[in-house]
């Protein structure tokens, strides 16, 4: 697994608690045993590096709005031109269609929009967000299952595909 971050690094590096290596503990947990690199996928040299990585990859996982992927030439059609049997797993807040498709989101927004915070907290008090990022983890789990099914389908057919996941 190779994690690609923006040039200045991902925000999750700095979420407390901070370890002795000055990285966030959650970042260290979620990225254990991954290789990592930073690049600018909007720049031609960054796009060339991504294309070289895609040519040797089985799966690309992208956590960006669909329009952002397209603007960086990382949409499914662009990746398939590099490697015809590639599997692209996309995770966005609201999916490819609909009025919110270009918006970003995270677990807290997903909890509010699905109504789960309405069912928490004290009866006379404000709602509470769950302390566990269950929307993020649930979305990741469904995307992982979908990706495994796509890998099996490719083994049987030789064809790649896109797997779409959304918080809602």
Task: Put a short name on every predicted segment.
Residues 1-162:
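N-terminal helix-loop segment corresponding to the beta1-alpha1 unit
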């Amino acid at each position: 697994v190779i994690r690609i971050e923006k040039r200045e690094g991902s925000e999750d590096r700095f979420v407390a608690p901070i370890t002795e290596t000055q990285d966030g503990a959650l970042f260290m947990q979620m990225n254990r045993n991954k290789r990592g690199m930073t690049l600018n996928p909007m720049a031609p040299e960054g796009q060339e590096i991504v294309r070289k990585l895609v040519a040797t990859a089985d799966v690309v996982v992208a956590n960006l709005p669909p329009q952002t992927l397209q603007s960086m030439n990382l949409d499914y059609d662009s990746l398939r031109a590099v490697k015809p049997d590639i599997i692209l797993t996309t995770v966005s807040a609201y999916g490819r269609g609909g009025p919110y498709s270009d918006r970003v989101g995270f677990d807290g927004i997903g909890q509010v929009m699905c109504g789960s915070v309405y069912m928490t907290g004290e009866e006379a008090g404000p709602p509470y967000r769950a302390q566990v990022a269950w929307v993020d983890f649930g979305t990741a789990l469904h995307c992982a299952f979908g990706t495994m099914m796509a890998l099996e389908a490719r083994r049987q057919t030789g064809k790649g595909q896109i797997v779409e996941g959304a918080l809602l």
